[in-house]
């Protein structure tokens, strides 16, 4: 036998490696298993004919084909109406009694993907809590009277005494440990700090569509058997089929919570009666759902909601009107990950997009056919100014009073822009300051987003080195709050110096300036 060439040896090595990989993945029998379960019989291949003559006597084969041992009712020609009755068992047992061919798992998956439609009571979706107890838990929030991180110590020495540094020397909440505060089941994608000041309420949503409500206990645990068994007061309910994108409260009624999702739906939750209403399902002209990436209530009209989508669309609608009409506008050809309204000029919005741009828009002016877009489906708005980033822009946020716009993205930077005066804005936006910051996440961590505090010119952002960093609008760092894991999704309390961050396992880190808490050990 002639010796193999180098090419042939390499080919044999590749074949062997691929076969080993298939064995490890257990894929060798998948195709035949699928055909078998579907009731499709693969015809046996006829052997290749030989040149020699064969004898005329042939073995007679059985005419009856071999039937699969497992077949669904559909393949047996039976109707679903033939079922005599439903067994008297609970839901979990009923799901486990599915057909023997594994269709019960598909049925369960279909149920999980079924969105909540219409108006519902949360108590109907939460079977392990009494309705009266739930109402009692949240009724205290039913009132409308709320009208470079890693080297912080060295930075602090260089900056000297900066106003606000002591103010944001916050303490980690320690009544319960962070690993005990599992507010959702999956990776947190949105958090919200309710504006109530007498009692803390933190709301979070995860990537599966579950929403968690945490009534924060401020009183220390006593050395008693009852308190040793105490757990964080958390209520969870599944309202969506995909990521919870944004959580907010209605400006005119803070007992009413607004929730949006990547599945295109917007829902409200009334804390006084735990009624959840369907506000809107955002769809295009083809009746396809448009995932909602971000939203914010208008400063000029608190009943009007501005929102952006995963496909680059933008619209506004009146939340008081059910089935409200809306007109879609195109602001990007790719996902808009973040949107913010300018508090000094409420007709201006900023967007950060996967197309690697930060853009400022004037929503008063319409552009019928935007030259920058490859689509011709919707009109757009007038572009005031643009900043081109090296990589995608993850977040945009305006300071409340001094005209600073912050953005961060996958290029590991935080950029600050002076947008106080419209007259000084050029078509090409230039940052007044760039801060190096470790904020590039991977697949298993939610995107880090800088957020200005609603009542102060300070912003916070999570750090991939497991911390929350706080800066003022001049770029001076005020605090570095260390955590055990990455608190990727942060939310400020709008009036108090409290901040919360959610991680990839559904847990919350809470920092406050309460005197009763004990500082985290260095």
Swiss-Prot record:
Q: Where is the composition biased (Basic and acidic residues)?
A: 75-84
Which residue stretches does the UniProt record annotate as biased composition, category Polar residues? Answer: 54-63
> One GO CC term of this entry?
chromatin
Question: What UniProt keywords are attached to this protein's entry?
Answer: Cytoplasm, DNA damage, DNA-binding, Nucleus, Phosphoprotein, Repeat, WD repeat
Q: Which positions carry Phosphoserine?
A: 64, 224
Q: Tell me the protein family, please.
A: Belongs to the WD repeat DDB2/WDR76 family.
Designated name of the protein? DNA damage-binding protein CMR1
Protein source organism: Saccharomyces cerevisiae (strain ATCC 204508 / S288c) (Baker's yeast)
């Amino acid at each position: 036998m002639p010796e193999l060439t180098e090419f042939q040896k390499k080919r044999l090595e590749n074949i062997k490696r691929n076969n080993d990989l298939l064995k490890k993945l257990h894929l060798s029998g998948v195709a035949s298993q699928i055909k078998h379960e579907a009731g499709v019989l693969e015809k046996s291949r006829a052997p290749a004919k030989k040149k020699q003559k064969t004898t005329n006597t042939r073995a007679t084969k059985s005419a009856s084909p071999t039937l699969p041992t497992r077949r669904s009712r559909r393949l047996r020609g039976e109707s679903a109406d033939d079922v005599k009755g439903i067994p008297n068992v609970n839901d979990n047992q009923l799901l486990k009694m599915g057909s023997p061919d594994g269709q019960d798992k598909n049925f369960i998956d279909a149920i999980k993907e079924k969105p909540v439609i219409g108006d519902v009571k949360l108590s109907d979706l939460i079977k392990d809590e009494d309705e009266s107890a739930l109402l009692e838990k949240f009724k205290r929030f039913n009132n409308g009277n709320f009208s470079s991180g890693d080297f912080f110590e060295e930075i602090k020495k260089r900056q000297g005494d900066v106003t606000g540094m002591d103010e944001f020397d916050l303490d980690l909440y320690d009544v319960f440990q962070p690993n005990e505060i599992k507010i959702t089941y999956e990776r947190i994608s949105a958090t919200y700090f309710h504006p109530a000041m007498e009692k803390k309420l933190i709301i979070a949503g995860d990537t599966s569509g579950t929403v968690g409500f945490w009534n924060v206990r401020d009183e220390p645990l006593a050395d008693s058997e009852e308190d040793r068994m105490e757990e964080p007061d958390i209520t969870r309910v599944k309202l969506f089929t995909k990521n919870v994108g944004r959580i907010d409260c209605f400006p005119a009624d803070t007992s009413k919570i607004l929730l949006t999702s990547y599945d295109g739906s917007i829902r409200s939750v009334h804390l006084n009666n735990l009624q959840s209403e369907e506000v809107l399902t955002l769809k295009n002209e083809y009746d396809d759902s448009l995932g909602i990436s971000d939203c914010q209530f208008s400063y000029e009209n608190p009943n009007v909601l501005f929102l952006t989508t995963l496909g680059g669309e933008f619209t506004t609608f009146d939340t008081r009107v059910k089935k409200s009409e809306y007109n879609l506008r195109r602001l990007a050809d790719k996902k808009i990950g973040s949107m913010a309204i300018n508090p000094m000029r409420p007709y201006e919005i900023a967007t950060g997009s996967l197309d690697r741009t930060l853009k400022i828009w004037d929503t008063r002016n319409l552009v019928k056919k935007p030259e920058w877009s490859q689509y011709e489906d919707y009109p757009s708005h007038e572009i005031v100014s643009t900043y081109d980033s090296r990589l995608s822009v993850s977040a945009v946020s305006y300071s409340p009073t001094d005209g600073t716009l912050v953005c961060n993205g996958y290029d590991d930077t935080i950029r600050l822009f002076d947008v106080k005066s419209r007259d000084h804005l050029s078509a090409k936006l230039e940052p007044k300051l760039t801060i190096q910051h470790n904020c590039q996440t991977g697949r298993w961590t939610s995107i880090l987003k800088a957020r200005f505090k609603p009542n102060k010119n300070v912003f916070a952002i999570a750090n991939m080195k497991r911390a929350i960093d706080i800066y003022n609008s001049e770029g001076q760092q005020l605090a570095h709050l260390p955590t055990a894991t990455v608190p990727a999704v942060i939310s400020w309390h709008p009036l108090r110096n409290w901040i919360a961050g959610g991680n990839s396992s559904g847990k919350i880190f809470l920092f406050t300036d309460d005197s009763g808490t004990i500082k985290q050990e260095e």
